[in-house]
């Protein structure tokens, strides 16, 4: 009798994606992050669902409803901190996944890469509107500052901001619609992730060498299912350690103060995973220029495949490109640190230099060094 998993219309899809999928035999642990992102998404949707059962999206009760979840709901504090720290784990996996793609040339799968960039933008939007929901000081002022950036758009800016706010300031209407967005976006992310996977399975996975691996494939199950389970255990262990020992390590103490439109916090800053982009935004003294730089810092990923000048796909055998890649990582860490610092000397100049270096590395230095490496191959 033929196996049902190969004939049943639904099972066949799952079988071709997770069981009998031909996979390169040499993909490293950097290829674990895709499945970890799927796990993060499932955890966020589940914890978020249980939080939504007790949360009220109203300016007068939002803050106290979060306090009620933490104090009165059975294991409410646990669900709340799993959700908050789950977002941090999500972004750690996301950045590792993108870094892997950059290092090993996975961006040459253009459809997969472009949907990935779209996924990144959607996840960032979800995290931003989600941060507003507890209605603490940083929630309110973060929402005010970031939505206000849209007023830099010529002619329609102010109208656009007031349209998003649903009034003349961040208020009840804003909170309600942000809750609606925060509820719907994860399902859009799930659909996009399925399309991301669909396009990936059209070409098959890349591998560390960047060389086609069609002649050496192994089935996804059991080899990579067991490898993914190991990665998942590490992820869950880290998340539980963070949630149970230091739940507020990555949060902002200002968010334990209820939102007050009459009192501005000393330092308005987003969650840690947006700090690099925030630093780039702040490093330009012009409002419109800053907004454009902020947008470009993320959208630059779309242009990566066009900037490929190397004859080799992966950086595995390109030491000079490797050096620039790790310089880029160090630069992003510097920007993340600067984004959390006050706007004063010497942080301003360091932020400006790091921002210039970020764009210079991606747009100029890496393509140039790739060309030099091509020449060196002929020696």
Curated annotation (Swiss-Prot):
Membrane topology summary = Multi-pass membrane protein
Q: What else is known?
A: Heme 1 (or BL or b562) is low-potential and absorbs at about 562 nm, and heme 2 (or BH or b566) is high-potential and absorbs at about 566 nm.
| Stated name of the protein | Cytochrome b
Which residues take part in binding a ubiquinone? 201
Please tell me where heme b b566 binds in this chain. 97, 196
- Regions that span the bilayer: 33-53, 77-98, 113-133, 178-198, 226-246, 288-308, 320-340, 347-367
Q: What cofactor(s) does the depicted protein rely on? A: heme b
Instruction: Please give the biological process terms from Gene Ontology that the record holds.
Output: mitochondrial electron transport, ubiquinol to cytochrome c
**Cofactor annotation comment:** Binds 2 heme b groups non-covalently.
Q: What does this protein do?
A: Component of the ubiquinol-cytochrome c reductase complex (complex III or cytochrome b-c1 complex) that is part of the mitochondrial respiratory chain. The b-c1 complex mediates electron transfer from ubiquinol to cytochrome c. Contributes to the generation of a proton gradient across the mitochondrial membrane that is then used for ATP synthesis.
Record-linked PANTHER family = CYTOCHROME B
Task: Give the matching Pfam families.
Answer: Cytochrom_B_C, Cytochrome_B
Name the keywords, alphabetized.
Answer: Electron transport, Heme, Iron, Membrane, Metal-binding, Mitochondrion, Mitochondrion inner membrane, Respiratory chain, Transmembrane, Transmembrane helix, Transport, Ubiquinone
Is Electron transport among this UniProt entry's keywords? Answer: yes
Family, similarity comment: Belongs to the cytochrome b family.
* Gene Ontology molecular-function annotations: metal ion binding; ubiquinol-cytochrome-c reductase activity
> Could you say which residues bind heme b b562 here?
83, 182
A GO cellular component annotated for this chain's UniProt record is:
mitochondrial inner membrane
InterPro entries from the entry? Cyt_b/b6_C, Cyt_b/b6_C_sf, Cyt_b/b6_N, Cytb/b6-like_sf, Cytochrome_b, Cytochrome_b_C_euk/bac, Cytochrome_b_N_euk/bac, Di-haem_cyt_TM
Assembly behavior: The cytochrome bc1 complex contains 11 subunits: 3 respiratory subunits (MT-CYB, CYC1 and UQCRFS1), 2 core proteins (UQCRC1 and UQCRC2) and 6 low-molecular weight proteins (UQCRH/QCR6, UQCRB/QCR7, UQCRQ/QCR8, UQCR10/QCR9, UQCR11/QCR10 and a cleavage product of UQCRFS1). This cytochrome bc1 complex then forms a dimer.
* Subcellular localization, as worded in the UniProt entry: Mitochondrion inner membrane
């Amino acid at each position: 009798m033929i196996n049902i998993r190969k004939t049943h219309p639904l099972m066949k899809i799952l079988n071709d994606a997770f069981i009998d999928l031909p996979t390169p035999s040499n993909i490293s642990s950097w290829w674990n992050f895709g499945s970890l992102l799927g796990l993060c998404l499932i955890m966020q949707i589940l914890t978020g669902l249980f939080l939504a059962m007790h949360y009220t999206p109203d300016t007068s009760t939002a803050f106290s409803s979060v306090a009620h979840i933490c104090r009165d709901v059975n294991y409410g504090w646990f669900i709340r901190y799993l959700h908050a720290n789950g977002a941090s784990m999500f972004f750690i996996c996301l950045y590792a996944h993108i870094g892997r793609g950059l290092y090993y040339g996975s961006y040459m799968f253009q459809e997969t890469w472009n949907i990935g960039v779209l996924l990144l933008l959607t996840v960032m939007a979800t995290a931003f509107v989600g941060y507003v929901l507890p209605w603490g000081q940083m929630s309110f002022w973060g929402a005010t500052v970031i939505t206000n950036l849209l007023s830099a758009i010529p002619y329609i800016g102010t109208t656009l901001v007031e349209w998003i706010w649903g009034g003349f300031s961040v208020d009840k209407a804003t909170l309600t619609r942000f809750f609606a967005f925060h509820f719907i976006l994860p399902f859009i992310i799930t659909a996009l992730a399925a399309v991301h996977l669909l396009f990936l399975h059209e070409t098959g996975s890349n591998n560390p060498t960047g060389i086609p691996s069609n002649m050496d494939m192994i089935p996804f199950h059991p080899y990579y299912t067991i490898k993914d389970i190991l990665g998942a255990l590490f992820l869950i262990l880290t998340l539980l350690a963070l949630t149970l020992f230091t739940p507020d390590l990555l949060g902002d103490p200002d968010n334990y103060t209820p939102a007050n439109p009459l009192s501005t916090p000393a330092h308005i800053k987003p969650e840690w995973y947006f700090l690099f982009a925030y630093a780039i935004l702040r490093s330009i003294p012009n409002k419109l220029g800053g907004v454009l730089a902020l947008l470009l810092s993320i959208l630059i990923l779309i242009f990566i495949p066009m900037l490929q000048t190397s004859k080799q796909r992966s950086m595995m055998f390109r030491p000079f490109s490797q050096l620039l890649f790790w310089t880029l990582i160090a630069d992003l860490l510097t920007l993340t640190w600067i984004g959390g610092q006050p706007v004063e000397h010497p942080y301003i100049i360091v932020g400006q230099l790091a921002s210039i270096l970020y764009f210079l590395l991606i747009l100029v230095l890496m393509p140039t060094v790739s060309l030099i490496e091509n020449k060196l191959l002929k020696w």
